[in-house]
UniProtKB/Swiss-Prot annotation:
Residues 50-83 are annotated as: Disordered. Keywords: Ribonucleoprotein, Ribosomal protein, RNA-binding, rRNA-binding. It comes from Mycoplasma mycoides subsp. mycoides SC (strain CCUG 32753 / NCTC 10114 / PG1). One of the primary rRNA binding proteins, this protein initially binds near the 5'-end of the 23S rRNA. It is important during the early stages of 50S assembly. It makes multiple contacts with different domains of the 23S rRNA in the assembled 50S subunit and ribosome. Forms part of the polypeptide exit tunnel. The lineage of its organism: Bacteria, Bacillati, Mycoplasmatota, Mollicutes, Mycoplasmataceae. GO terms for biological process: translation. This is Large ribosomal subunit protein uL4. One of its GO terms (molecular function) is rRNA binding. One of its GO terms (cellular component) is ribonucleoprotein complex. The keyword Translocase does not apply.
Length: 208
């Protein structure tokens, strides 16, 4: 497929030929879902923790003698059946929330989301960004020129460009990453994908 490449003033300057296998497939919803769940699960931390009977304070003495009281035998007042006792099989912080997704499914999810951006006219390709210094004001002007200033936008450059990152940091709804940091969740979370020509080629080389 061929798509227009714009300059930062919003002018069409040339066409770029992109691989239909990466940018023009029918989106696979299940692959997208599985990949996002896997990505989100990997971010979870084990923060739940309860004390076992060995960790609860007290309960070192046998509450009453073994025989002769008529009551059930008890070894500790911190056994699980007692109020204030330890918890049996409770949550621990070392739980593993990770959900694995194989490489083929993950790659299919990437191609699906990229194709979805093209299909919905939410992909904008620019030749390059030109900033002499970090400037939020200039970035706002660029986004207005590209007619995406009121959209939640993911900006992707081939490599990390400090001037672009610093120029966009203070703009609400805008996130800037490099091509090797691209992920399905960020792509889905943004309405518009603003990507440089170099970054688009780099992404295509990975998933073609």
């Amino acid at each position: 497929m061929k798509l227009q490449v714009l300059d930062i003033k919003g002018n069409e300057i040339k066409e770029i030929a992109l691989n239909d296998y990466v940018w023009g497939i029918e989106p696979h919803q299940q692959a997208i879902y599985d990949t996002v769940i896997s990505q989100q699960a990997a971010l979870r931390q084990g923060t739940k923790k309860v004390k076992t009977r060995a960790e609860v304070s007290g309960g070192g003495r046998k509450p009453w003698k073994q025989k002769g009281t008529g009551r059930a035998r008890q070894g500790s007042i911190r056994a699980p059946q007692w109020k204030g006792g330890g918890v049996t099989f409770g949550p621990t912080p070392d739980i593993n929330y990770k959900k694995s997704v194989n490489k083929k499914v993950r790659a299919l999810a990437f191609r699906s989301v990229l194709s979805l951006k093209v299909k919905e006219n939410n992909l904008v390709i620019v030749d390059k960004f030109e900033f002499a210094k970090p400037s939020t004001k200039e970035m706002v002007v660029v986004m207005k020129n590209l007619k995406i200033d009121d959209q939640k936008t993911l900006i992707v450059t081939k490599e990390k460009e400090e001037l672009v990152v610093k120029s966009s940091n203070n703009i609400t709804g805008v996130k800037t990453i490099s091509a090797n940091q691209l992920n399905v969740f960020d792509l889905l979370n943004a309405t518009k994908l603003l990507i440089t020509e170099e970054a688009a080629i780099a992404v295509e080389e990975v998933y073609a």
